[in-house]
Amino acid sequence: MEPIEQQLTELRTTLRHHEYLYHVMDAPEIPDAEYDRLMRELRELEAQRPDLITPDSPTQRVGAAPLTAFNQIRHEVPMLSLDNVFDEESFLAFNKRVQDRLKSTENVIWCCELKLDGLAVSILYENGVLVSAATRGDGTTGEDITSNVRTIRAIPLKLHGDNIPARLEVRGEVFLPQAGFEKINEDARRTGGKVFANPRNAAAGSLRQLDPRITAKRPLTFFCYGVGILEGGELPDTHLGRLLQFKAWGLPVSDRVTLCDSPQAVLDFYRNVEKDRPTLGFDIDGVVIKVNSLALQEQLGFVARAPRWAVAFKFPAQEQMTFVRDVEFQVGRTGAITPVARLEPVQVAGVLVSNATLHNADEIERLGLRIGDKVVIRRAGDVIPQVVNVVLSERPEETRPIVFPTHCPVCGSDVERVEGEAVTRCTGGLICGAQRKESLKHFVSRRAMDVDGMGDKIIDQLVEREYVHTPADLFRLTAGKLTGLDRMGPKSAQNVVNALEKAKATTFARFLYALGIREVGEATAAGLAAYFGTLEALQTATIDELQKVPDVGIVVATHVFNFFAEESNRDVIGQLLAEGVHWPAPVVINVQEVDSPFAGKTVVLTGSLSQMSRDDAKARLAALGAKVAGSVSKKTDLVIAGEAAGSKLAKAQELGITVIDEAEMIRLLGA
């Protein structure tokens, strides 16, 4: 080995050691200035001999070139989410379900951790070297963020120690400490940059930078909490044991991990963490509770999207008091007019809240709310701000009543409130710019026509400039016309045109959902498409015929019938088809020719399945001639009840409908 190679090896080993002491052990031995000096020395030597630079060198955390787009990484082991509980009663019920499933009266040993409010990531090590990293994504596929994760100093590029598996995928949370968050926003305000609403958004935005050099400047950190792939090695047989092993290999683990030997001990841990929450220095939104024994975890297994052996115990939504300065009225896709309270800005659960929905006139009346009132604001689920109540004892002398508009605030059309409905609606239809915008945004959304790259701001400009009036107009757009929009260059414009062309090939169900018929969500659209098969059959269906579709009652049937009875709607559909929107011809299943116990039956799935996903079960049932519905009614022939089946099972029993379990379903599917 050359002297310079020896020097490089020693420097890298020294720097990794001090990174471990700083980020994992929280016990630095040297000042930052000395660390910086060692890093500079390493950089200078590598500059002399670039052929000796290794991928796991501490200098390689910031060297990747900017990405043009994120590639996708498929998770070999799905990244499942956790079920939630929100109060002690729900947790105790969860504890009992676990004990019942284990057929044990002895207390379970629980491993309790903090529920970090950051971004879940998967990091793959091969022979101890970091080779890839990905976001959770949809649980099956995530975004490749390897270059950015390599810039996070808390994450070792190379594990140290003995008995490291050949392939080890660790999972954890990337997050931003509050001090770092405040510094980022302080710098942004000074330079006119983006100010983030909360540390989680800042962490997500930092991790998804196309230029890793920007990520490297953000003080992100990481805690490890689990494992995915494990090949060519072994891990301890308890969750806590695994976390301690990860820490020994150089991976950071929270110091607030605790074993609890009873439900009461778990509740004590929860209360202590909630009390300490303001002083932790980073955001959490609850605690995570896991069965410590891996053998018991395997015995308990999984439901469709979550393990049975773990749960997230969320903290209550945080509340603050503030004043209502005004109330404005927004118009939605279906003409619904929603009152929105404009508030004196206030921090609630780490977010600056300045608006809150008031839902409708009935809610305003229920609250007894007036403009100028002092109110209690809650972020329900830590996401959607809402007004909880009015502080009547502190009502100011000068308050004003909230007057609901008699005409649309956008287009001036009359408003109406149908008897029996809480919602007031604009009658303007597509002549209303607000409805047009929201309808088009729905039309191009991912679960509808899925037009990649056509965001809300583009739709807003297209409507405001009178370029687009109906969904069909979207497919007539040219790159030249789009290039005239704000922040839209020729390449971006052509990408949108290409995406529109690609979106023309869709499915009947997606097309129906995209049309935005009132009360027709994805499931109902799929049911209508499966039942009628063709657009022609659906357009000519009567209200009685529509009600034969599972889950379609008189209200939905009337909305669908009225939509297709409207000449302007039929005209838009004709234009869409003329522009080339199409979908595959229906596969007609003749139930008389299908030899299956499910043929011609209306079937409802309820509860959690353990042997296959709900979507797989629906697809297999439909292939055997079943009509899969979402709710139980007198038209239901069969209910398949998985774990934790609830009200649907009770209703089926009340109506005397045949009920089978998952095992029987699987037997019949193979019959």
Curated annotation (Swiss-Prot):
InterPro entries: BRCT_dom, BRCT_dom_sf, DisA/LigA_HHH, DNA_ligase, DNA_ligase_AS, DNA_ligase_CS, DNAligase_adenylation, DNAligase_N. This is DNA ligase. Keywords: DNA damage, DNA repair, DNA replication, Ligase, Magnesium, Manganese, Metal-binding, NAD, Zinc. The active site is at residue 115. GO terms for biological process: DNA repair; DNA replication. Signal peptide: none annotated. Zn(2+) binds at residues 408, 411, 426, 432. The gene is ligA. DNA ligase that catalyzes the formation of phosphodiester linkages between 5'-phosphoryl and 3'-hydroxyl groups in double-stranded DNA using NAD as a coenzyme and as the energy source for the reaction. It is essential for DNA replication and repair of damaged DNA. It comes from the Bacteria. The keyword DNA damage applies. GO terms for molecular function: DNA binding; DNA ligase (NAD+) activity; metal ion binding. It holds the Pfam family DNA_ligase_aden. It comes from Salmonella enteritidis PT4 (strain P125109). Its cofactor is Mg(2+); Mn(2+). One of its GO terms (cellular component) is cytosol. NAD(+) binds at residues 32-36, 81-82, 113, 136, 173, 290, 314. Coiled coil: none annotated.
